[in-house]
């Protein structure tokens, strides 16, 4: 046979063969990729360096080395003997001896009394008297550490007759536990040339510092190419039906309606003024550091293990950060995703739901309102929920296109999109629903074509499409590495089980940002829309006027997604953001379900309206709270919203009233709607869900806009984002003011010595040592939802800033006080008086001498007093006067201080200098303590006007900084400390969030979780630096710490690098849990 038909048959036979071969090759290449070899960069720490006793810093991100070998000549211990060396005790250690818990975590070879002892993780391994160690018989001390055991031996020494094994080598071994010591460097108390034979060698765990070999790279290239070819062949087979190709985008895709404009305006404005999500700083820091590290490590937890298989979305953010790290730029892809979601909902989803949805304005407005109700509070950050929400929609649309055209290529594309969505983040598991609903259509379409092309030609390209994501996940990692990382994360935690899903909903009903008005309303209204859609479908077989298949698949995807979310390892409410796209779709279905056409009963529609009111009332029974800096200035951020009456009470009353109306419709026989045109207000009442969702959306947008207005000229998220458009992209760093030297701003007393001026007029009951020895801040009880964390390093976390917990000193200060002062205040020039006493308390009054105010044009904006104790605001005040008033001892007025800090610890009371009249030239402190409770007392230092510089000027953009994960997005110009080849850069500063944020979220980064705090607490000594938020002086924005090494002279260690080829199953050693 000749002609077009013969040619077409030949093409299809060729396409069938290509589909089979290319599809199978693509699948095989994908399956083989995780097992193919990679090129590993190896790293060893060898010490001593430069031939001298010199401490070096080498903090390992994985805490321990793969293996460790130490050899020390016995004669090296001579540097620890003799009166001239009494301050030297450590021959060699992997942690600074001064650090808290150093002996619990590290290796120390040290002199204890007259013995040289090897201690690892608080366990002695081997010990020998120093006189024997220094004898000619002793040659070397050796120590080795592996995952299964550690051993130590004094080579040349034998046990004496009184020991357990006379004549045997002096040797010790510990096993049955992973005793490998934590390494943050190599430290010694000795100096001078290193003796011959001294050697420490640690193999650093760089199993994740890998790149693909040429073989693996070629396999991935071939695999992707074969997949593309297979899908092309599948398209040729699809076209065998002879039908014309349908246009890819709907005809009205690029058109614009007023509703589109409104949704777009809301998203764009929210992009600037809206609240961010809690993990934005976490993700931004990971992305910023990943380029230098060579892989996307989980920076704040899990010992530097990679984010794979969920890291590809973060890799895109890392590329995006090359342009700018400013919030408004980094979140721009999220804005595009939001717009794309709405375009897909309005142009692809709603028309597919049937004629009733397509032509219903109520459906469109409800879809838009419920979509925004989800997107605004949950998806305005860097978390993967936005791309997951979009991916779910695109997967569903591709499936529906395949069903509508009876073609397999759209289904294959749906599988690719679904797989990418699935691995874009842990919450991508919600995309399982969108993939599962493709099974039915896939079977139907395959059955229609199998008789002509066979199963292999149809399913091989589908298999290649389903596995192509493997290339992305394992492009530079091995199967063994990722399996170990995944199981290790589960062991470290948090790793909550499916039956712990109630924790997520429990948090939804807390009075916190996790259970805020916006989040609670979004989830509850989605559940309500889902319930009414299911009920109507079950009662009538379908929602009248909607397409049966698409509407059922949307409902099915949503139900499956809720079930799939049970298997996420953490249970946070921000993870509900994956439902943003589905919420819009369900909103449209629910709106159609309660129209007068579908639900003719006025009683039932009124009951639905009552349910909407009740859900809204329940949503307002919490705070209008937002995470961290997004909360600044927002109305009702720490209280239930109210105006005259509580919103929740008013809405509950309206809900009850609606139920009474429904009962009247039922009992009066007026249940059926009259058949006449509806007025506009009646049409609004028929769409209560649209009214409620838009009311909440407006409430949210107005709240955050008012927050920006209320804060101005002080810092706010909105002001910062708008400033970024003018090139001011450093966020909070330009508004946090730092007091580098608290001694420099002390005011000069008039007519009194500095040591006596503080209590010169009256100091009844106040004394230099009237301060308890421990003034640590009150502990904060465990917060709701801490079940999301694994065990933390300490059971109770306090809000005490470092150095503000008090204590005593050996030497007395200028006025005889032995109290340890905070913030670097010099006791030789700074007096202190307190009203506390041991035993029975007594009333106390303090009135200081007058202090001279500097010229206003030369003075800073703040008046500050460092204080400790528990007292009310009015009990400490500053009185001001002119020179004449001060001479007559008649103050012109007084002001009180803002108390920002954690009682009873030391903190800085502050008052804006502008609150003191410009004619005032002198001030004095007045305090009264009439409360005789032992816990009620006051301690004060003299007033000062700090010399302030911005945090950006002090910290800059070059110093390595430990940015707590909550603050990363607010400080985009500060450089997070890097890590590379398994070794962490030593940070010089730490920036923390406010007290609540620091207490609640520091456990994420602690030692037990494998975070950076487990490193810095061993290597560095923190000290708090006073800070203030410009024009928002009474705000607890967070805090700044200066990090000082325990060994200031230690140098960064030099690593010996190499390369090695590793198979996909290779593993150097078990990862060690803390």
Curated annotation (Swiss-Prot):
Keywords: Antibiotic resistance, Cell membrane, Cell wall biogenesis/degradation, Glycosyltransferase, Membrane, Transferase, Transmembrane, Transmembrane helix
EC nos: 2.4.2.-
Domain of life: Bacteria
Transmembrane stretches, start-end: 15-37, 214-236, 251-273, 415-437, 452-474, 516-538, 573-595, 608-630, 645-667, 684-706
Subcellular location: Cell membrane
InterPro entries per the UniProt record, alphabetical: Arabino_trans_C, Arabino_trans_C_2, Arabino_trans_central, Arabino_trans_N, EmbABC_dom1
GO biological process: Actinobacterium-type cell wall biogenesis; cell wall organization; response to antibiotic
Catalytic EC class: transferase
Predominant location category: membrane
GO CC aspect terms: plasma membrane
Pfam families: Arabino_trans_C, Arabino_trans_N, Arabinose_trans
Role description: Arabinosyl transferase responsible for the polymerization of arabinose into the arabinan of arabinogalactan.
Protein name listed in UniProt: Probable arabinosyltransferase C
């Amino acid at each position: 046979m000749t002609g077009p038909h013969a040619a077409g048959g030949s093409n299809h036979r060729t396409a069938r063969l290509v589909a089979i071969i290319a599809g199978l090759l693509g699948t095989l290449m994908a399956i083989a990729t995780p097992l193919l070899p990679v090129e590993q960069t190896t790293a060893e720490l060898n010490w001593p360096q430069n031939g001298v006793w010199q401490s070096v810093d080498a903090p390992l991100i994985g805490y321990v080395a793969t293996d460790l070998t130490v050899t020390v000549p016995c004669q090296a211990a001579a540097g620890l003997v003799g009166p001239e060396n009494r301050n030297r005790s450590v021959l060699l250690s992997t942690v600074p001896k001064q650090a808290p818990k150093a002996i619990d975590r590290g290796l120390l070879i040290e002199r204890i009394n007259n013995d040289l002892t090897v201690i690892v993780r608080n366990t002695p391994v081997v010990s020998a008297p120093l006189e024997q160690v220094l004898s000619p018989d002793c040659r070397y001390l050796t120590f080795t550490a592996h995952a299964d055991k550690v051993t130590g031996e004094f080579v040349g020494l034998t046990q004496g007759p009184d020991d357990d094994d006379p004549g045997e080598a002096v040797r010790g071994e510990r096993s049955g536990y992973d005793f490998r010591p934590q390494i943050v460097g190599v430290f010694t108390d000795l100096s001078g040339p290193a003796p011959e034979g001294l050697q420490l060698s640690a193999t650093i765990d760089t199993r994740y510092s890998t790149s693909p070999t040429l073989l693996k790279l070629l396999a991935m290239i071939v695999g992707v190419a074969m997949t593309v070819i297979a899908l092309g062949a599948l398209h040729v087979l699809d076209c065998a039906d002879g039908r014309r190709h349908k246009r890819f985008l709907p005809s009205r895709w690029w058109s614009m309606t007023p509703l589109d404009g409104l949704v777009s305006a809301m998203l764009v404005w929210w992009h600037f003024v809206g609240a961010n999500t809690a993990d934005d700083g976490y993700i931004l820091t990971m992305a910023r550091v990943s380029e230098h590290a060579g892989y996307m490590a989980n920076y704040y937890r899990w010992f530097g293990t990679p984010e794979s298989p969920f890291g590809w979305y973060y890799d895109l953010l890392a590329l995006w950060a090359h342009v700018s790290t400013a919030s408004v730029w980094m979140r721009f892809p999220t804005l595009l995703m939001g717009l794309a979601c709405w375009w897909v909902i309005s142009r692809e989803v709603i028309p597919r739901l049937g004629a009733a949805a397509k032509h219903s304005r109520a459906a469109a407005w409800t879809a838009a309102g419920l979509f925004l109700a989800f997107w605004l509070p949950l998806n305005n950050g860097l978390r993967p929920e936005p791309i997951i929400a979009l991916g779910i929609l695109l997967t569903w649309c591709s499936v529906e296109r395949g069903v509508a055209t009876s073609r397999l290529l759209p289904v294959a594309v749906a599988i690719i999109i679904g797989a990418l969505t699935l691995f874009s983040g842990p919450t991508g598991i919600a995309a399982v629903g969108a993939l599962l609903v493709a099974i039915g259509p896939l079977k139907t379409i395959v059955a229609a074509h199998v008789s002509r092309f066979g199963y292999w030609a149809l399913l091989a390209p589908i298999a290649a499409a389903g596995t192509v994501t493997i290339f992305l996940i394992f492009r530079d990692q091995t199967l063994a590495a990722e399996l170990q990382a995944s199981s290790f994360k589960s062991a470290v935690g948090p790793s909550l089980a499916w039956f712990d899903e109630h924790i997520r909903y429990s948090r939804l009903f807390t009075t916190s940002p996790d259970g805020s008005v916006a989040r609670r309303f979004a989830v509850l209204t989605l559940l309500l829309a889902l319930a009414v859609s299911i009920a109507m479908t079950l009662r009538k077989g379908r929602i009248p006027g909607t397409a049966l298949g698409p509407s059922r698949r949307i409902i099915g995807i949503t139900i499956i997604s809720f079930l799939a979310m049970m298997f996420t390892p953490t249970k946070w409410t921000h993870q509900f953001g994956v439902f943003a796209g589905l919420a819009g779709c369900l909103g449209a279905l629910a709106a159609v379900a309660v129209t007068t056409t579908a639900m003719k009963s006025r009683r039932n529609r009124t009951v639905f309206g009552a349910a909407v009111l009740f859900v809204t009332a329940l949503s307002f029974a919490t705070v209008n709270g937002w995470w961290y800096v997004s909360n600044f200035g927002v109305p009702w951020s720490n209280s239930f919203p109210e105006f005259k009456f509580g919103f929740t009470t008013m809405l509950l009353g309206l809900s009850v009233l609606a139920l009474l109306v429904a009962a009247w419709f039922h009992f009066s026989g007026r249940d059926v709607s009259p058949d006449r045109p509806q007025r506009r207000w009646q049409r609004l009442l028929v769409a209560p869900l649209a009214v409620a969702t838009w009311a909440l959306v407006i409430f949210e947008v107005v709240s955050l806009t008012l927050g920006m207005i209320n804060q101005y000229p002080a810092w706010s998220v909105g002001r910062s984002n708008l400033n970024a458009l003018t090139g001011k992209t450093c966020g909070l760093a330009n508004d946090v003011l730092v007091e580098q030297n608290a001694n420099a701003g002390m005011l000069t007393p008039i007519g009194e010595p500095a040591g006596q001026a503080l209590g010169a007029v009256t100091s009844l009951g106040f004394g230099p040592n009237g301060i308890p020895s421990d003034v640590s801040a009150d502990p904060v009880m465990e917060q709701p939802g801490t079940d999301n964390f694994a065990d933390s390093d300490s059971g109770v976390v306090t809000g005490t800033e470092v150095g503000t917990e008090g204590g005593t000193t050996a030497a007395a200060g200028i006025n005889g006080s032995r109290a340890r002062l905070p913030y670097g205040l010099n006791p030789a020039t700074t007096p202190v008086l307190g009203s506390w006493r041991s035993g029975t308390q007594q009333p106390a009054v303090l009135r200081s001498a007058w202090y001279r105010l500097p010229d206003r044009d030369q003075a800073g904006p703040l008046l500050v007093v460092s204080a400790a104790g528990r007292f009310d605001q009015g009990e400490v005040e500053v009185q001001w006067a002119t020179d004449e008033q001060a001479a007559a001892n008649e103050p012109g007025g007084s002001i009180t201080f803002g108390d920002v800090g954690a009682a009873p610890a030391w903190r800085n009371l502050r008052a804006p200098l502008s609150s003191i009249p410009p004619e005032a030239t002198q001030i004095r402190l007045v305090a009264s303590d009439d409360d005789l409770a032992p816990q009620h007392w006051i301690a004060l230092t003299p007033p000062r006007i700090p010399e302030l510089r911005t945090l950006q000027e002090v910290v800059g953009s070059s110093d390595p900084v430990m940015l707590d994960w909550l603050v990363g997005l607010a400080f985009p110009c500060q450089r997070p400390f890097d890590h590379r080849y398994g070794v962490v850069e030593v940070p010089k500063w730490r920036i923390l969030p406010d007290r609540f944020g620091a207490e609640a979220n520091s456990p994420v980064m602690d030692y037990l979780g494998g975070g950076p705090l487990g490193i810095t607490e061993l290597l560095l000594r923190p000290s708090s630096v006073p800070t203030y938020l410009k024009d928002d002086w009474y705000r607890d924005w967070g805090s700044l710490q200066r990090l000082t090494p325990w060994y200031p002279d230690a140098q960064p260690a030099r690593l010996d690098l190499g390369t090695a080829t590793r198979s996909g199953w290779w593993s150097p050693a078990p990862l060690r849990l803390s």
